[in-house]
Design a protein with these regions (language model features):
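Conserved catalytic SET/PR domain of SAM-dependent protein methyltransferases, capturing the structural core
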Residues: 1-160
Length: 160
């Protein structure tokens, strides 16, 4: 009897981009995910975006930070862990707006010179500068009302 063939996928950037795009919620039109010079992958404009344009509204379920962390630690989704139940926005230092599925929003990298911002009532992403075609969308993570515990986490020191 011949040995069973085992499929092995070879990691390439192209394969990873394909995986990401197959598993992402496309909530920000006219953008695409690609390699970022800032960090890993980023979100880029397919065409120019004018300052003041609303890119998307963000939805989700409200929950306190502690409950979110407890749920996050107890849910094991294997290879899908990075695509489901990991995206949130801080509404205040104790409350999060959590999305069950990963969206394009999560690929907006941090910068102290952002070209998009989170606006509230309703919670949305808005361009604060003109953004050129193929420019990366960037946001200042520190502008969210983050908890002190989150801000002092050594892994989050890039936000300071």
């Amino acid at each position: 009897m011949a040995p069973a063939l085992v499929k092995h996928s070879i990691y390439t950037i192209e394969n990873e981009l394909r995986r990401i795009n197959d598993r992402i919620v496309d909530n920000i039109r006219n953008t695409y995910i690609d390699i970022s010079s800032i960090h890993g992958f980023g979100l880029f404009a397919k065409k120019p975006i004018q300052a003041g344009a609303i890119l998307c509204e963000l939805d989700g379920q409200k929950m306190d930070w502690g409950h979110y962390e407890k749920l996050r630690k107890t849910i094991n989704l294997g290879e899908y862990q990075d695509y489901i139940f990991m995206e949130w926005n801080a509404l205040d230092p104790k409350t999060l707006l959590v999305r069950a599925f990963r969206t394009k929003y999560s690929y907006i990298n941090h910068s102290k010179t952002p070209n998009v911002e989170i606006k509230y009532s309703p919670i949305r992403i808005e361009a604060v500068k003109d953004i050129g075609e193929h420019d990366e969308l960037v946001i200042d993570y520190s502008k969210e009302p983050l908890s002190e515990e989150y801000k002092t986490d050594k892994e989050k020191s890039f936000i300071q």
